[in-house]
UniProtKB/Swiss-Prot annotation:
Source organism (scientific name): Campylobacter fetus subsp. fetus (strain 82-40)
Entry annotation: catalytic residues: S99 (phosphoserine intermediate)
PROSITE patterns named among the record's database cross-references: PGM_PMM
This protein's encoding gene: glmM
Function: Catalyzes the conversion of glucosamine-6-phosphate to glucosamine-1-phosphate.
Name of protein: Phosphoglucosamine mutase
Keyword tags: Isomerase, Magnesium, Metal-binding, Phosphoprotein
Binding site for Mg(2+): S99, D242, D244, D246
CDD domains on file: GlmM (cd05802)
Cofactor: binding details: Binds 1 Mg(2+) ion per subunit.
Length: 446
């Protein structure tokens, strides 16, 4: 059994992710982090799901059982945990959240002492300890060696100051009418405070979490409700966050949802114009539209592509000394300000871009038009290595000659292959996706 997925441990609360699993996972993580412990403190935060109380209690029990002292800070965004772990000199940070998933799911994410997500090797080491009964039993403490926990409620101020410092001091949000959809999630207190203190006229939606309404018809996965309010209130811009606020979706003044690649492209050129781009390079994933490549090329900015997942975006950024990157889905990383995707930092940078250019959002983001794409999720019998499929290379070469970009990858959780074709000629792309489907049906189902 494998515990860790692409972003920590995640599952239905009370089933796959129950109290026993959470406690044992915390014990395993505590044992792992104790090897290089400096302060013997671990920070624990959560989003607004009801199951967070159960999981938080189990995690505290597991960590204190192996001798760790725990600092509980309550509902806070995931990027706040990354920042505060380093800022408060903790050995590690733990975030209890299932991000954009429904309320009955939950998850556990880990950060090292520098606020970075754990490497695959570190996750594997924790997983090995989790399944090793003898190691777990031998590392439980007794007497005064048992850890203790305390709750601190005022750390929100540290994070708010940090976020506000990412906004240019030469600008003010005064006169900007902003609508925020905080998704009944972890950012429900922080986001309105930040925008109001910077001078914006701030209207807030979905800021009454009750444990079961996080992401429920609201937030980054449902920007249509935000769009209606932006139009009704004649706002300048709207921002929607997901449950743990590491993702951002933007709505312009005409109630149109801004394409994620347009967001990346415009922000990259804004940073470059203001000498905030360390290199004339950014990182996106293989899912980003080729229109982004072409737009950046006109501005002499190179696009590097990573695998899907903000963890892989960040890895490539670090490897290449790049300070900006992100995903089409709205995970955007400004590494000068945050160690992970931070929806609030992104929202402030978008606002700064609007003010600096003195233009409407629709004018700025409408300059990048995505090329037509066709996506297909094909059910298959077996997942054979793609490089072993006879005729696939020839098919890809033929499509490339026709100006069509291809991306074929298996689902990580089900017997499905995801097919993507992209090109400037929509009719041709539509015709060719049918041919590609036939190829894979024959190759993987016969």
């Amino acid at each position: 059994m494998k515990l860790f997925g692409t972003d920590g441990v995640r599952g239905r609360a009370g089933e796959k992710l129950n109290a026993m699993t959470a406690m044992r996972l915390a014990m395993a993580a505590g044992i792992y982090f104790r090897k290089n412990s400096i302060t013997n403190k671990i920070l624990v935060g959560k989003d607004t799901r009801k199951s967070g109380y159960m999981i938080e209690t189990a995690i505290v029990a597991g960590l204190t059982a192996v001798g760790y002292n725990v600092i509980q800070i309550g509902p806070m965004p995931t990027p706040a945990i990354a920042f505060l772990t380093e800022d408060m000199r903790c050995d590690a940070g733990i975030m209890i959240s299932a991000s954009h998933n429904p309320f009955d799911d939950n998850g556990i994410k880990f950060f090292d002492s520098f606020g970075n997500k754990l490497s695959v090797e570190a996750e594997q080491a924790i997983e090995n300890i989790f399944f090793h009964n003898e190691i777990i039993e031998n590392n439980q403490k007794i007497g005064l060696e048992i850890g203790q926990s305390k709750r601190i409620d005022d750390v929100i101020g540290r994070y708010i100051v940090h976020i506000k410092n990412s906004f240019p001091k030469s600008l003010t949000l005064k006169g900007l009418r902003v609508v925020l959809d905080v998704a009944n999630g972890a950012v429900y207190k922080v986001a309105p405070t930040v925008f109001s203190e910077l001078g914006a006229e701030t209207i807030v939606l979905n800021d009454e979490p009750n444990g079961g309404n996080i992401n429920d018809g609201c937030g980054a996965l449902h920007p249509e409700n935000l769009a209606k309010e932006v139009k009704r209130l004649r706002a300048d811009i709207g921002f929607a966050f997901d449950g743990d606020a590491d993702r951002l979706v933007v709505v312009d003044e005409n109630a149109k949802v801004v394409d994620g690649d347009a967001l990346l492209g415009v922000l990259a050129t804004y940073l470059d114009e203001n000498k905030m781009l360390d290199k004339k390079e950014i990182v996106a994933t293989v899912m980003s539209n080729a229109a982004l490549d072409d737009y950046l090329a006109k501005h002499k900015i190179k696009l590097l592509r990573s695998n899907v997942g903000d963890k892989f975006v960040l890895e490539m950024m670090k490897e290449n000394g790049i300070n900006f990157g992100g995903e089409q889905s709205g995970h955007i990383i400004f590494s000068d300000f945050s160690k992970t995707g931070d929806g609030l930092v992104s929202a402030l940078q978008v606002s700064a871009c609007l003010l600096a250019k003195n233009k409407k959002a629709s004018e700025i983001f409408g300059s990048i038009k995505a090329y037509p794409q066709k996506l297909s999720n094909l059910k298959i019998i077996e997942k054979r290595p793609l490089d072993e499929l006879k005729g696939l290379k020839e098919l890809e070469d033929e499509l490339k000659k026709l100006g069509i970009r291809t991306l074929f990858r298996y689902s990580g959780t089900e017997n499905v292959i995801r097919l993507l074709l992209e090109g400037k000629d929509e009719a041709l792309v539509t015709k060719k996706i049918a041919e590609v489907e036939k190829f894979f049906i024959k190759a993987l189902n016969e």
